[in-house]
């Protein structure tokens, strides 16, 4: 099967102004090359002949080079980065006009990525336009790296392209139910700051710009600890850090069928970035799993476990702003042994919303009501969007939910 794109990546590209760009065509061209990279990587994993493996490796590398040098990829990256700035009102970032975006394209299309020096991102220099350029070039590399890693990531990893946090919550709902045998949850937060960088780079194989990725990994501590979470959408660091957790399902002997349905009877796993929840049938199984991860998995990758909690699901636990707990089906009848699983916004996430709203009210007391509404609406809409698929009606009905407005 031919996985090469017959047309050059930059064919028929003529841009006079930003508003004249045919975005469906740009997305189509980038997606086509990404699909070819994914297909070639899948074939590489299934191939057993060493000669054919080398040929497929060259195909993957050539396709990635084509995509990295594609101006369509650069256009899409500029649109993605600048658009995320505009819609994230919680971070004060300079707005970009169409002329600014076009000028960015004219400057970056001549940049040699091999000679680019990665920058450190923090909340103090986020308004710097050089940081914006760095994020755009990161996204150019990420678009070429994503399909290769998509072919390798396990079904339990949800922090990747095309997945959302609500998908991880939905997976938890399917794994932990009233009729399920796994009634204990092992919560683990990995500390990835001291991860073995050689292990990550070896996972990338023949990626064309390993030296640039290595430079980003050297600066991982500054980028990983930043509170400006919007960079996770376009930054290379989170997806590179996910690489060191590949093999977690193999370590736990978790096996999946053709439709990504778990067929093994042992622990079950849900992973989001550096956090994971392992569901076990007993407390002893959870303790054994934790010791196994510490002794083999973490030691080989040179990573540490920040926190590890073992809780019973009937007591409930928090995961990324949500509370997961098994409740009695009938509160009035203590003899009724039936259970139901409810997922609600956690008290901490509700408190966080109230603190953000309170800070805005205190900061803009002298401003008009319309100005204040423009500031608080994005926050309310954002949390309402993330809570819409869970049991959240009680959070809106509370008069004083974990913190009150002035």
Residue spans of the language-model regions?
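Non-catalytic, polymerase-adjacent accessory regions of viral genome-replication enzymes
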Residues: 1-110
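Active-site and adjacent loop segments of nucleotide-processing enzymes
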Residues: 2, 10, 33, 283, ...
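Glycine- and acidic
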Residues: 15-16, 124-128, 153-157, 185-187, ...
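Short coil/turn segments at secondary-structure boundaries
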Residues: 41, 48-60, 72-81, 89, ...
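Short, conserved non-catalytic motifs in the polymerase core
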Residues: 82-94, 114-138, 151-164, 186-187, ...
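Conserved polymerase palm-domain catalytic core
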Residues: 107, 116, 120, 167-296, ...
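Amphipathic alpha-helical segments in well-ordered regions
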Residues: 139-144, 148, 243-251, 379, ...
């Amino acid at each position: 099967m031919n996985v090469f794109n017959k047309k050059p990546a930059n064919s028929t590209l003529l841009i006079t102004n930003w508003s004249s760009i045919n975005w469906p065509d740009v997305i189509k061209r980038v997606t086509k090359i990404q699909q070819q990279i994914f297909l070639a990587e899948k074939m590489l994993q299934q191939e057993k002949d060493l000669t054919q493996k080398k040929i497929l490796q060259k195909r993957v590398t050539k396709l990635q080079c084509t995509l990295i040098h594609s101006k369509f990829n650069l256009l899409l990256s500029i649109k993605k980065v600048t658009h995320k700035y505009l819609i994230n009102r919680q971070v004060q970032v300079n707005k970009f006009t169409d002329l600014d975006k076009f000028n960015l394209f004219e400057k970056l299309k001549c940049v040699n990525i091999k000679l680019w020096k990665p920058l450190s991102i923090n909340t103090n220099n986020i308004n710097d336009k050089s940081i914006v350029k760095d994020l755009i070039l990161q996204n150019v590399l990420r678009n070429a790296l994503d399909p290769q890693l998509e072919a390798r990531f396990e079904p339990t990893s949800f922090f990747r392209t095309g997945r959302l946090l609500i998908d991880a919550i939905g997976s938890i709902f399917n794994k932990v139910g009233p009729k399920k045998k796994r009634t204990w949850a092992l919560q683990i937060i990995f500390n990835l700051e001291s991860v073995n960088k050689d292990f990550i780079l070896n996972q990338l194989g023949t990626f064309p710009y390993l030296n640039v990725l290595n430079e980003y990994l050297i600066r991982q501590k500054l980028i990983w600890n930043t509170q400006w979470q919007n960079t996770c959408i376009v930054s290379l660091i989170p997806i590179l850090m996910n690489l060191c957790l590949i093999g977690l399902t193999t370590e736990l002997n978790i096996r999946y069928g053709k439709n990504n349905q778990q067929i093994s009877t042992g622990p079950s796993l849900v992973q989001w970035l550096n956090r994971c929840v392992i569901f076990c049938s007993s407390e002893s199984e959870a303790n054994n799993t934790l010791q196994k991860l510490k002794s083999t998995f973490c030691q080989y990758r040179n990573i540490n476990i920040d926190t590890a909690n073992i809780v019973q699901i009937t007591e409930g636990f928090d995961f990324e702003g949500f509370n997961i707990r098994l409740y009695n089906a009938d509160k009035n009848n203590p003899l009724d042994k039936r259970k139901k699983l409810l997922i609600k916004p956690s008290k901490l996430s509700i408190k966080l919303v109230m603190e953000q709203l309170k800070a805005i009210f205190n900061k803009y007391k002298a401003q008009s009501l319309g100005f204040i509404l423009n500031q608080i609406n994005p926050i309310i809409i954002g949390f309402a969007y993330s809570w819409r698929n869970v049991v959240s009606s009680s959070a809106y009905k509370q008069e004083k939910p974990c913190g009150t407005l002035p």
